Amino acid sequence: MSKAPVRVAVTGAAGQIGYSLLFRIASGEMLGKDQPVILQLLDLPQAQKAVKGVMMELEDCAFPLLAGMVATDDPNVAFKDADYCLLVGARPRGPGMERADLLTANGAIFTVQGKAIAENANENVKVLVVGNPCNTNAYIAGAAARKVGRTNPNNYHGMLRLDHNRALSQLAAKTGRPVSSLKKMVVWGNHSPTMYADYRFCTSNGDSVKALVNDHAWNNDVFLPTVGKRGAAIIDARGLSSAASAANAAIDHMHDWALGSDDWVTMGVPSDGSYGIPAGVVFGVPCECKNGDFKIIQGLEIDEYSREKINKTLGELEDERAAVADMLK
C-alpha cells in the first residue's frame, strides 16, 4: 500500500539553496524513494514569479513522488499541516551591516515563522534552520513556538551538518581514507568560524583517525581554520555562497532525523545541559537518530583543549542570545 504524502515547507524557495534543494526532495532523496511529498513554498511577494518558474521546472521533471505544490508569501499558508520545515530564507548581511543588525533583522523573520509553525504545522513537525546565523535563528524560532505550545521545542534545529561534511572531506584527504569509512565525527557549537570540529573519537575501519593524523599543528593551524572558513573561501572562489553543498547538508540532516542513521551525526539542537552547555542554547552536538527521533551522545571526554574550543564557540552563541533577548520577551 502506498504511503500518504507528507508536507514539506521550504522558505526562500526562489533562492540558490532552494533551487539546489527542491528537486532532490521531490526525487525522494530526503525522505525515501517510497514517500510522496507535497511541497509548500514560501518566499517574499517580489519573488513569487521566480517561485512559479521553479514550480514549472519541478512539474517538468515528472517526479513520481511529487504529489502537489503550493506557492505563497503567507507563512500561515506555507506551514499549514507541515511535517517538515526547512527554513532557508534569511536576511543576508549587507555592506556596512553590523552582526547585531543582522541578528535583529533575522529575529523579526524567525519570530514570525516560529509562531506560524507552532500555530499551523503538524504537532510533531521537524524544523531545520539553514538561513544564517542558523543556531540563533533556530533559537528564536523555537522561543516563539514555545509561547504558542503544540509543537515540540526540541525539534527546532540549526544546521551544523555542512561543517560536519566539510570536516569529513578534509580528514579523508589528510588520511587517504575514503569518506565512507569515517565514523563518529563531531562538530561542537555554532555554525561559524568558531565551530570546533573534533575527530578525537573518529574511526576509519576501526583505526583511530586521531592516531592516523597524529599532527596537532595540522589540526590547530590547518584543519580547523579550513573547515571554519570554508564558506568564505567558496565565496572568494565562486563569487557566490555555497548553495549546493548547503542544500546537500540539509538533505542529510533531515534524512537521518526522519529515517535514522547508523553513525553519529552533528545536529544543532536545543541543549539539555549536556557537556556544560546551558539548557536551551542551540548548539552543535553529536547525536544518534532512530525511529524518527534523535538523542545526544552522552559521556564523551572533553579534554582541556576541547573545553577551550567549546567555550569559545559557546561564548559567541551566548553573545548572540543576549543580542536578541529583548525581542523574545
Swiss-Prot record:
Catalytic residue list: 191
Cross-referenced InterPro entries: L-lactate/malate_DH (IPR001557), Lactate/malate_DH_C (IPR022383), Lactate/malate_DH_N (IPR001236), Lactate_DH/Glyco_Ohase_4_C (IPR015955), Malate_DH_type2 (IPR010945), NAD(P)-bd_dom_sf (IPR036291)
Question: What Pfam families has UniProt attached to this entry?
Answer: Ldh_1_C, Ldh_1_N
Q: What is its EC number?
A: 1.1.1.37
Q: Which UniProt keywords apply?
A: NAD, Oxidoreductase, Tricarboxylic acid cycle
GO molecular function annotations of the record? L-malate dehydrogenase (NAD+) activity
What catalytic activity does the UniProt entry give for this protein? (S)-malate + NAD(+) = oxaloacetate + NADH + H(+)
Kindly list the positions annotated as binding substrate. 93, 99, 132, 166
> GO:BP terms for this protein?
malate metabolic process; tricarboxylic acid cycle
Enumerate the CDD domains for this protein: MDH_chloroplast-like (cd01338)
Q: Tell me the enzyme class.
A: oxidoreductase
Q: Where does the chain bind NAD(+)?
A: 12-18, 106, 113, 130-132
Top-rank taxon of the source lineage equals: Bacteria
- HAMAP family recorded: Malate_dehydrog_2
Similarity remark: Belongs to the LDH/MDH superfamily. MDH type 2 family.
Functional note: Catalyzes the reversible oxidation of malate to oxaloacetate.
**Could you tell me what this protein is called?**
Malate dehydrogenase
Gene of origin?
Answer: mdh
